[in-house]
Every structure is written in structure tokens, then in C-alpha cells.
């Protein structure tokens, strides 16, 4: 699976704006070796996203079943949350919960965006992937190195984008969470079409 905080102060998340990242790669600069302190700061911006959708019953099409999914995202400037398109796309209702809080807040999608590379990562660089594993309420932080940089298709839209692959363990539910290099976001964790890369 290929992967990807910004300092943020939580004033109120009652009217959260979610910004979708279809291209997945958001490069913000070079890393510095203050990893543990930077990871502690990064965790404060990670949110758990709850997506709800109604799925039809094929036997009784007039009945629908509500399904709930959880994934990750992270706060950026302007009271916005950055995540992947597949995390919140095609869902009828969204809620977010910030790190360390039991309260869920209603959220809505405000924009879709395509982000281009500003800095390339290189094979062998250390990264940290953050997010909430599926059915987990505690942020998972996994460390790895960049093992490959290449174009791949994003499973949600089949758009070919430049991605990084890592040996860090990426659990389901972490999708949409940040991948951090030093004190910068290197990208966003996302799903992959190829089962061999997961």
C-alpha cells in the first residue's frame, strides 16, 4: 500500500470542512530528525472519520441498510480536514472525532482537490504512517522506509499518480491519515488496486 500533519489548534469542530485529496500526494518539504517530538505533534491533528451510506437490498429494493465505515484524516489550516476521496465520497452522512475526545461532530465535504508534488521523497528515507486502524480507537503509528517511488493507479478513480511505497505496516482504516517525514507531511495513506502491494 502506498502512503502519505500540519500544526492545528482545535477551536471547535462543529462545522468541519472536509477537503478531499484525489491525487493523494501532498509534498510539503524536507524532513528533519526530530521524529518523536514531531510524531507527538502530528497525532494531535489526526481525526477518525465515520462515513455512513445506505445500501440497497437486492431482494427487496425498497429497503435499504445503513452501513458505517471508519477511516482517518488530519486537520489542516482553516478548520479543514484532509483525507482521501474514497474515505468520504459517495456517503450520505459524515462524522469526525478528534484525537483524545469521545465526541463526534457532523462534517460535510466542501471541496475536491488534486495536489501535485513539491518535493520528491527518495528510496531509503524514513516515514511514519498515522491513522486509526479499522475498529480501533487508538491512533496507530508505524515506522518504515520508502521502498519505491512510481506512478500507480488510485483505486477510487483509476487516475495515475506518483506514489511512494513503504515497508511500514498499513492497516485498513488508516487510509486518509498522514504519512510524516520529520515535521512535514510526505503524503496521505491510500488504497491500492494491487493486492501484492498491501
Curated annotation (Swiss-Prot):
Coiled coil: none annotated. This is Putative Do-like 15 protein. It comes from the Eukaryota. InterPro entries: Peptidase_S1_PA (IPR009003), Peptidase_S1_PA_chymotrypsin (IPR043504). Residues 48-198 are annotated as: Serine protease. Transmembrane segments: none annotated. Belongs to the peptidase S1B family. It holds the Pfam family Trypsin_2. Gene3D superfamilies: Trypsin-like serine proteases. SUPFAM superfamilies: Trypsin-like serine proteases. The active site is at 86 (charge relay system), 175 (charge relay system).
Amino acid at each position: 500500500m502506498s502512503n502519505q500533519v500540519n500544526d492545528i489548534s482545535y477551536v471547535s469542530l462543529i462545522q468541519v470542512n472536509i477537503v478531499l485529496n484525489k491525487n493523494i500526494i501532498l509534498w510539503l518539504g524536507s524532513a528533519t530528525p526530530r521524529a518523536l517530538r514531531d510524531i507527538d505533534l502530528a497525532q494531535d491533528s489526526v481525526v477518525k472519520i465515520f462515513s455512513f451510506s445506505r445500501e440497497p437490498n437486492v431482494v427487496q429494493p425498497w429497503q435499504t441498510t445503513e452501513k458505517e465505515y471508519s477511516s482517518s484524516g488530519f486537520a489542516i489550516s482553516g478548520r479543514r480536514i484532509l483525507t482521501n476521496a474514497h474515505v468520504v465520497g459517495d456517503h450520505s452522512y459524515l462524522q469526525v472525532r478528534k484525537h483524545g475526545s469521545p465526541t463526534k461532530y457532523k462534517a460535510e465535504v466542501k471541496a475536491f482537490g488534486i495536489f501535485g508534488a513539491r518535493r520528491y521523497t527518495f528510496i531509503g528515507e524514513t516515514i511514519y504512517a498515522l491513522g486509526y486502524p479499522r475498529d480501533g480507537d487508538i491512533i496507530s503509528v508505524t515506522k518504515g522506509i520508502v521502498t519505491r517511488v512510481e506512478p500507480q493507479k488510485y483505486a477510487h478513480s483509476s487516475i495515475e499518480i506518483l506514489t511512494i511505497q513503504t515497508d511500514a505496516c498499513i492497516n485498513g482504516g488508516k487510509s486518509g491519515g498522514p504519512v510524516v517525514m520529520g515535521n512535514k507531511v510526505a503524503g496521505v495513506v491510500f488504497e491500492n488496486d494491487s493486492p501484492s502491494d498491501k
